[in-house]
């Protein structure tokens, strides 16, 4: 197989792991594109993206245009004369002229089994919706949002213990392997593009802090899915004792209860059991303001008076 001349475009750690796989392959990464350096940390010091840091470590040229819509940036990219451009969590829109520049076009690594969960938050929405599996799709890019022809798909079961954080790690391992496999198929012509079924498509909207507020009028199962989807960001929470209390881990039971939604049924070392519109939510790990996440047993030792049976979390204390 003749090595491909690759432009890699990506920004966060998830992208850097794919770049590392390409560096370790027989292909030639001739340039990287990544977001401009951003202020980070307490000192707001300009910080390079993980992709830039890795590229510099391997002496790969780095380009950081604010946009790829202007002719100068497009000409700069065309002059690289790449065979293919690989895009993983880059963060900039690629206009059609850029998509058409490399000989084999541009391909993208997307964290879902397309056409399900197109858009910004596919990993989180799979958990939020209660999906039983997720995966990675290697896709030929077009001008739509994750609408291009599919080149390769992998599948990953979603476990009851999975959170967005754990799925992110699993897909960050699965994605690079799938990408290298897809490049082999593209090079030897064995990979056949498959169109997406538009009737199965849906959109993975970005998460918001407001959406992370626990609504006890939902079912216990849905709240359990929310808590897993919103870990590690924005983290599910409820308000009680004039405090925002984050919930990191929970379980649920479909067993019906007579108490009003939001009522504490029991508070023990095993967890805080709360009535919902359908079933019971059992909170296992919480975080009080300005504190670290702790097991419920430790929180009850310090704030047991906040979480007694019969207290309704829908009613804030004065």
Swiss-Prot record:
SUPFAM superfamilies documented for this protein:
FMT C-terminal domain-like (SSF50486), Formyltransferase (SSF53328)
One Pfam assignment:
Formyl_trans_N
Q: Does the keyword Protein biosynthesis apply?
A: yes
**Enzyme class label:** transferase
What Gene Ontology cellular component terms go with this record?
cytosol
Q: Which CDD domains match?
A: FMT_core_Met-tRNA-FMT_N, Met_tRNA_FMT_C
Keywords, A to Z, come to: Protein biosynthesis, Transferase
* Molecular functions per Gene Ontology: methionyl-tRNA formyltransferase activity
InterPro entries reported for this sequence: Fmt, Formyl_trans_C, Formyl_trans_C_sf, Formyl_transf_N, Formyl_transf_N_sf, Formyl_transferase-like_C_sf, GART_AS, Met-tRNA-FMT_C
Q: Its catalytic activity?
A: L-methionyl-tRNA(fMet) + (6R)-10-formyltetrahydrofolate = N-formyl-L-methionyl-tRNA(fMet) + (6S)-5,6,7,8-tetrahydrofolate + H(+)
- The UniProt record gives the binding positions of (6S)-5,6,7,8-tetrahydrofolate as 112-115
The EC designation for this entry is 2.1.2.9
Function field: Attaches a formyl group to the free amino group of methionyl-tRNA(fMet). The formyl group appears to play a dual role in the initiator identity of N-formylmethionyl-tRNA by promoting its recognition by IF2 and preventing the misappropriation of this tRNA by the elongation apparatus.
> Which HAMAP family does the UniProt entry name for this protein?
Formyl_trans
Q: Which family does it belong to?
A: Belongs to the Fmt family.
Name the NCBIfam families for this protein.
Answer: fmt (TIGR00460)
The name on file for this protein is Methionyl-tRNA formyltransferase
